[in-house]
């Protein structure tokens, strides 16, 4: 096999093979030599051998017919852009913000639930969770009526629309307040009888159950945040040490909110047991 270099493109040498070749001037990979040897029609076969020497660039075209090179093989290159420090910090910040927001919402939900549980004294917050069917849609009682506490054992409800009196009365009866509303056609009065010892114990169990549900919600928030940190580690955006530090900070934050739940629980328990 005889070979010659084209002089028309000095910067891109072209290796041409004559049909009657004996030995190439440059050493070719075995895979290329096998293709050349098995070629049935050298006039139609074009080979792009991916090899590099001092004289032949990577991916140079090889024409078996000895004619000009028709095509130059182009290599596809995959470029992976690494995340910047700013992008990584933004992702971490988003996770932390989401965690705090969810924890605050958990505390607020628990506080609302506790306020709706009746204690020894009348409290407008006892009606926070009551919804009234108003013109075909459920709305909060406090949004359609003014609620006041004339004394420590009664509540007074004055609706903005008197046509809603019946609906308000029905909603109170169907609630778990355990009181009978007095509808005089203008306002609704609620007289709160003293809590019995058994009723106080029942409500104490309800408070304990809701408190535990709040703690479970916090643990679930922590679990989801840890999964997000693990994902960033797998994406090589965080190191193992970074994740350990973030997990430690997350646990400290969880402990703070767990303490808040415990404080709310103890305060409500104290109110329930106060005669």
Curated annotation (Swiss-Prot):
Q: Which UniProt keywords apply?
A: Chloroplast, Coiled coil, Plastid, Protein biosynthesis, Transit peptide
Q: Does the keyword Acyltransferase apply?
A: no
Record GO biological process: chloroplast organization; defense response to fungus; embryo development ending in seed dormancy; plastid translation
Q: Where is the transit peptide?
A: 1-82
- GO cellular component entries: chloroplast; chloroplast stroma; cytosol; thylakoid
* Keyword Kinase carried by entry: no
Positions the record marks as coiled coil are: 215-271
Subcellular localization, per the record?
Answer: Plastid, Chloroplast
What one GO molecular function would you report for this record?
Answer: copper ion binding
Which top-level group of life is the source organism from?
Eukaryota
Quote the InterPro entries the UniProt record gives: Ribosome_recyc_fac, Ribosome_recyc_fac_dom, RRF_sf
Tell me, in a sentence or two, what this protein's role is. Responsible for the release of ribosomes from messenger RNA at the termination of chloroplastic protein biosynthesis.
Q: Which family does it belong to?
A: Belongs to the RRF family.
Q: Which NCBIfam families does the record associate with it?
A: frr (TIGR00496)
This protein's name: Ribosome-recycling factor, chloroplastic
């Amino acid at each position: 096999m005889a070979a010659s270099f084209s002089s028309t493109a000095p910067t891109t040498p072209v290796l041409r093979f004559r049909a009657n070749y004996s030995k190439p001037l440059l050493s070719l990979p075995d895979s290329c030599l096998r293709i050349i040897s098995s070629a049935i029609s050298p006039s139609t076969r074009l080979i792009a051998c991916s090899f590099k020497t001092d004289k032949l660039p990577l991916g140079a075209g090889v024409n078996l017919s000895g004619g000009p090179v028709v095509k130059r093989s182009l290599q596809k290159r995959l470029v992976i852009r690494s995340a910047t420090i700013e992008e990584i910090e933004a992702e971490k910040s988003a996770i932390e913000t989401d965690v705090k927001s969810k924890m605050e919402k958990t505390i607020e939900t628990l506080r609302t639930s506790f306020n709706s549980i009746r204690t020894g004294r009348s409290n407008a917050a006892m009606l926070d969770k009551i919804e009234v069917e108003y013109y075909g849609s459920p709305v909060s009682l406090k949004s359609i009526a003014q609620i006041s506490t004339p004394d420590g054992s009664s509540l007074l409800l004055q609706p903005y629309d008197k046509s809603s009196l019946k609906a308000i009365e029905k909603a109170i009866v169907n609630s778990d307040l355990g009181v009978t509303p007095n509808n005089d056609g203008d306002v609704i009065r609620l007289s709160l009888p003293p809590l019995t010892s058994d009723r106080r114990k029942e409500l104490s169990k309800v408070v304990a159950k809701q408190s535990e549900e709040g703690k479970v919600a916090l643990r679930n928030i922590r679990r989801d945040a840890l999964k997000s940190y693990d994902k960033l580690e797998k994406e090589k955006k965080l190191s193992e040490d970074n994740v350990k530090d973030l997990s430690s900070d997350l646990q400290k934050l969880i402990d703070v909110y767990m303490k808040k739940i415990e404080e709310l629980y103890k305060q409500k328990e104290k109110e329930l047991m106060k005669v």
